[in-house]
Amino acid sequence: MKEWFKKNKYILIIFIIAIIISIPLFRKDLDVYFDDGIQHIARAYATYLSIQNGENPEVLTSLANGFGYSWDLFYGPFSTILILIGKLITTTFIGGYKFTLIIGMLLSGITIYIFANKLTKSKPTGVLIAVLYMLMPYHLNDM
């Protein structure tokens, strides 16, 4: 166990920092209806209804006044699947959306760490680059 912590200490540091950066998402009064938040939540809800009704979730029949709309033309289904998995964990679509944002922050930090580590051959530099990347205004603004 000690060996595992020693081997993965930099990824654990990134994980802890990603959770600290994501703390504002845990507020209940956080407005997630900005940027693309409302579209992702509405899409996840419509996909959930399609699955519940036994329909093909590629065409969301509850949208466009019942005519259906294929939202997956513009966005892939992976983000919707993550929101629905988050909904299973948190029981709400907003909680599922926040769960997806936290997972995205964590995965982006780990991915940029791996890239920076291969590029610079230095694990501490990789952690620094990962933390700076996670703290970029784009990430913080879109959360």
List each language-model region with its residue ranges:
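Membrane-helix boundary/interfacial segments in multi-pass membrane proteins
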Residues: V32-Y33, I38, N65-F67, I89, ...
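Start-transfer (signal-anchor) and selected internal transmembrane alpha helices
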Residues: M1-L25
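Membrane-water interface at transmembrane helix exits
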Residues: Y48, I83, K87, Y113-T120
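Conserved short loop/turn motifs at secondary-structure junctions
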Residues: V32, N65-W71, K87, F99-L106
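Membrane-embedded helix bundles of polyisoprenyl
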Residues: I14-I20, T100-L119, K123-M143
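Loop-to-helix entry region of an early transmembrane alpha helix in multi-pass inner-membrane enzymes
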Residues: P77, I81, L88-I110
